[in-house]
Amino acid sequence: MQIQFHLYNTLSRTKEVFNPQDQANVKMYVCGPTVYYNPHIGNSRSGVVYDLLYRIVIKIFGEKAVKYVRNITDVDDKIIDRAALLGVTIDELTDKVTKEFHKNMAYLGCMLPSIEPKATKHIDVMIAIIERLIAKDHAYIADNHVYFDVLSAPNYTELSNRNLEEMFEGVHVENSKTKKNPQDFVLWKPAKQNESANMNFESPWGLGRPGWHIECSAMSYKYLGENFDIHGGGADLIFPHHTNEIAQSRCAFPSSTYAKYWVHNGFLTVNGEKMSKSLGNFITVRDLMDKQIQGEVVRLFLLSSHYRRPLDYNDKAIEDAKKTLDYWYRAIENINVQKIDLPHDFMQSLLDDMNTPLAVKIINDYAKGVFISKTEEERQLNASAIITCANFIGLMNKTPHEWFNSGVDELYVNELVNKRLEAKKQKNWLLADQIRNQLLEEKIILEDRPDGTTIWRKE
C-alpha cells in the first residue's frame, strides 16, 4: 500500500496528497538565513520544521531520492550596514554568522541539507535570468536599476490570495519616479559610492548587486531546475519574497510552474509579543546555548505546536519541554531498548500535515505505558517505541545517564559520593548529611540502594 502524505499547500489553501513530479528525484528548496546577525529563535523554528519535513520525505522515498537545497543569503543591504557598524569586512561578518548558523542547526539536531549554496557564488545565474526577463518585456532598466514589471506577471496575487492594493497596504515600497509602477521591485541595483568592493559585481548594467528575490529564483533553478516539488519558508515570506519569486521565475521560464507545493511555518512570539530588539525580547539561539538549555529541549518546544500555528516562547514552555523529555528518558532508563518499525499511529500523525502535537502525545502515551506495564516484555516494547519515535523526529539521541547528567562534573560528584560512603562506614552521619545537602544545593539527587551502593542523578 502506497504511503499518502497530506501536506498543506499555501498555493491552493488546502491539504493535498504529496505527489512529487518524480518519485526518484524529489526536490525541495527552503529559504535559509541572511547572515548579518546571529539567528534568533524564530529562524530556528523554520530550521527545525523543514528538517522534520526532510526526514518524512526521506522516509517515504529514500534518502538517495531526495535533494534538499537551503540557501545562504550573503549579499544584502543589512549585511553592508552591520559590517560598517561593527567595523569588520563583509567576508568576516558573513563567515562568522554562517558558522554560528551551522552551530545552531547542529545544536537543534538538524540534518545537513543536500546543498547549501551561497548567493555570492551564483551572480552569473542571476544575471542570466534578469537578461531573460528584460528580453521578454517583464523587466526594464531605469536610473541604473533593473526593475521587474509586476503588472506584466500573470496571477501575481495567487500565492497571497489578496488583491494588489491589499497586498501593498502597510508595506514599505521604495518609490522612484523612474518606475513604471510603484509595486515594481528591483532585480539589480547599482553600487553606491564608498561601498565595499566585494559586495558589488560586474554586470551588463554596471557595477552593482542583485535584489533579494532574484537570488532564490537563481539558486533553485541552478540546483533543482525550472520545476520542483516543495518550497518552504516562514509565513512572513509569502509576500513579498515568495510572491516575487514565483512571478519572476514563471516569467523567465514560461513553461514552468516553479514550485508545486508551498509550505509556510507560523510566527514565533516571545511572552505574547512580537520579537524585536526595541522591546528587549530579541532572543538568539546562542542565548539559549549560553544558558545551557539542551538543544533537544528547544527542538521539542519548537515541535510542540503545529508548524502552521503561532508559537509563543516563554520560560514555562521551555520548562514543560524539559519535563516531557525527562519523563521520556526516565521511562527508558534501565530497559534494554531496541529500534523497531515506526508505530503506525505515530507515522500517520506525521503524514497528516506534520501533526507534531499528536505525535508528541503518542510518545507520551508510550511512556505512560512503560510505568503501568505489568510485564517486562510490555515495558520493553513501550520503551522501544519511545526511542524509535523520538529518534525519528530528532530527539532522544543521548542515553538516560548522559541526559540527566549533562553539564555535571562527574569526577567531582563521584568523589563526593565516595567520600560520603566512607563517612557512612565510619558512622560519621553528620558529614554524610552535609555532603548530601551540598550536592542537593547543586541539584544532584542521591539515592541509597539496599545493597549499600549510591546512585546519583541531576534534578
Swiss-Prot record:
Its main location: cytoplasm. A motif ('HIGH' region) lies at residues 33-43. InterPro entries: Cys-tRNA-ligase, Cys-tRNA-synt_Ia_DALR, Cys-tRNA/MSH_ligase, Rossmann-like_a/b/a_fold, tRNA-synt_1_cat_dom, tRNAsynth_Ia_anticodon-bd. Zn(2+) binds at C31, C216, H241, E245. A motif ('KMSKS' region) lies at residues 274-278. It catalyses: tRNA(Cys) + L-cysteine + ATP = L-cysteinyl-tRNA(Cys) + AMP + diphosphate. The keyword Signal does not apply. One of its GO terms (cellular component) is cytosol. Monomer. Belongs to the class-I aminoacyl-tRNA synthetase family. This is Cysteine--tRNA ligase. It comes from Rickettsia conorii (strain ATCC VR-613 / Malish 7). The lineage of its organism: Bacteria, Pseudomonadati, Pseudomonadota, Alphaproteobacteria, Rickettsiales.
